[in-house]
Design a protein with these regions (language model features):
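Charge-dense, helix-prone N-terminal extensions
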Residues: 1-120
């Protein structure tokens, strides 16, 4: 797992009703593929490989929102990814159980992104 100390510190300071869910999302991303790195961008955890893959913003209070910046470019059909725009997709997790239930599909999304970036 490519855990970034800056992100760990950010999470330690986070006062949010869904902090455990946000932490579970982070763990799921980092466990999905060893190529994934993380940082803080736009005041939220951002997951990267050959560019920004997704950010997990703490603004929503009823779910942990994950914005896949260029989600429309991720190869394959992924029910986890929602949205119809030209570029972005998003996923929402209401609780830790929903993160765990979506963990395998999230890993598929992450690997598809990483593989597509390696393929050029």
């Amino acid at each position: 797992m490519n855990e970034n100390l800056e992100v760990s510190a950010w999470l330690a300071e986070l006062d949010h009703p869904l902090k455990e869910v946000i932490e579970a999302v982070r763990t799921a991303f980092l466990d999905a593929d060893e190529r994934i790195a993380e940082t803080i961008k736009w005041k939220s955890p951002t997951f990267m490989y050959e560019g920004n893959l997704a950010s997990s913003g703490p603004k929503a209070k009823k779910h942990a929102a994950v914005l896949f910046h260029r989600g429309a470019e991720i190869p394959g059909d992924h029910a986890l990814l929602q949205g119809e725009g030209k570029m972005a997709r998003y996923a929402r997790f209401a609780d830790v159980a929903s993160v765990e239930a979506g963990r395998r599909e999230l890993a598929d999304v992450v690997r598809a992104w990483c593989d597509s970036k390696e393929a050029g």
